[in-house]
């Protein structure tokens, strides 16, 4: 062993005192799987593991159903009158349901087999739903769909599951102008399509982005698209790469392995456009193929491609009128360039209220007051607030509070402030959230109360 004396410059401490307000409600910080209705007037999305619908842009969110299961991945029928979605329950497993938005409380379970369902999508006629069904065991143990997941379909009226093909890493099934072929996406093979019997796979397009930092001395390959979805009306596709959303033109080339790199969209091999400034999630097409919707946090973004193209042409025309070169893009031009329209989606649920008086006594307390350690200390908690920390025999409790006081003797134990892990790998299931997540409990057991 050896020691080295070294001076290292540090930047300013990033510390913010955020107020924590006791309110009756909790505001959701994220909307998931947002889907806009075919006519563009309504939004269905997942928040707090329940599906909500609202009128755009400023309607009040309402629960779609009164089910007690976890809900997710809503998708509109072609008519816009029904929404299909998946459910999950720790005991009963998952299913696919549909709900009518024109007939109140009309909810129907479509699947007979319990399992792990995801990525439901209607065909263009509206008489079938295609989806992925995965292993219950893989989902329980790893939170993933697993290698044995299957692509299947079911009648929109309900019934038996019908096998199409193994997913083989493919996901995000979708349809375009007709329902003759099912389009799929995978990180390794990009966008492809198959027939309803799983045959005649046609590889259409691969999209890659920047090369992220890897290992010193070893160059990382370009990042593949997380998923690619073809436009329902046009020869375009959206691609999500490293949480940024792009739209690329699909040229008719006759090539079997068509690929494009969008790390610099101005130099891409065929037209491409970056839609996001700070990133985006859960990207999807509008029914007309003119709009791409995505979310970030609790905001929904609507990117209108024809308007964006028109704005670009106007900026170029202004440059030519002013005898400027096309390459001379200044801050003023960037400020004038098209930006996706943003709507903040505010979803609230009632907060569980914690009431009572608890004394944790006779513990060794490592405080946040410098290096102070209280060997025989106590923590007094009222409702959901720590009101006093000090030596056990110095904690003052009013006589009127003694009857409601709950005391916990922690002799031989140590109380520490909760740890913040800013690079936690909690391994949660990404698409279907569980009510009970063992990785959260394991982190909490080791004192981690905040993760990022």
Describe the predicted segments one by one.
Residues 1-9, 26-29, 44-52, 56-57, ...:
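A flexible loop/linker signature enriched in serine peptidases of the S9 family
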Residues 10-31, 267-276:
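A short helix->beta-strand "capping" segment at the edge of beta-propeller domains
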Residues 21-35, 217-228, 278-283:
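Signature of short aromatic-glycine-proline-rich micro-motifs recurring in repeat-based ectodomains
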Residues 208-224, 264-284:
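Conserved blade-ending motifs and adjacent loop-strand segments that build the rim/top face
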Residues 310-354:
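Non-catalytic propeptide/linker segments at domain boundaries
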Residues 371-416:
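Histidine-rich, glycine-flanked metal-binding segment
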Residues 413-452:
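Metal-associated gating/positioning segment near the N- to mid-region
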